[in-house]
Amino acid sequence: SNYHPNSLAQSLRGRNSMQIGVVVSDISSPFCSSMVRGVGHTLLEAGYVPLIVDSKDNLELEEHLIQTLLCRRVDGLIVNTASYVNPSLIRVACDGVPVVLCDRYVSDFRFPFVGSQHFSVMPKLVSHLKEEGFCKVAFFTQEYHTNSARFNRRNAYLQSVKEIFPEENGEALTYVLDLSDNKNTARCIRNLLDSCAPGEVPAIIAVNSVTCSHISGVLDTMGLE
């Protein structure tokens, strides 16, 4: 085995700093802002001080920040991780540091996890949109292969479309966006509209609040609602 215990992490055992490291993937997103408020309030009520850092959805930066938090002798970590594949975080847990994942999980290791119930919520949303008269429902997402939350939301969407809009191809209605490329997003929206018959109106489900805000801005520039 190539596993070597981390002496710094092991030195944390038996010590209480009453500090918890909180690693978020994008502090500017509404979700992370809400998460920080909720986690911070809960920790303070329990007598812990949250040390909050932002990885900017960058795995290398996340790894650096976690090591910095460990140097501060935190008693544990709450992590909204940047990547589904995260051997560094697994090593930290194996070294004895308590780690809880929030919203996004990691492959190949069973961390304590707090997240959304995508597969119970998505069918209700898609069914509601059909009842409202939308002809089809598209799914607009950022790259999802290394992000478990986006990946699960996409899979929940595909399953829901298969059940509620059996005549539609959920894969074909999934659009992967680069949020820095407004022109490409506009092309995706136009492609979706062109796939509808005259008079029909499609709906768009955004993978998260940041994507939703981006789509809304592009729709405004296109003169659409």
Question: PLM features: residue spans?
Answer:
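Active-site-adjacent beta->alpha loops and helix N-cap segments on the catalytic face
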Residues: Y84-C94
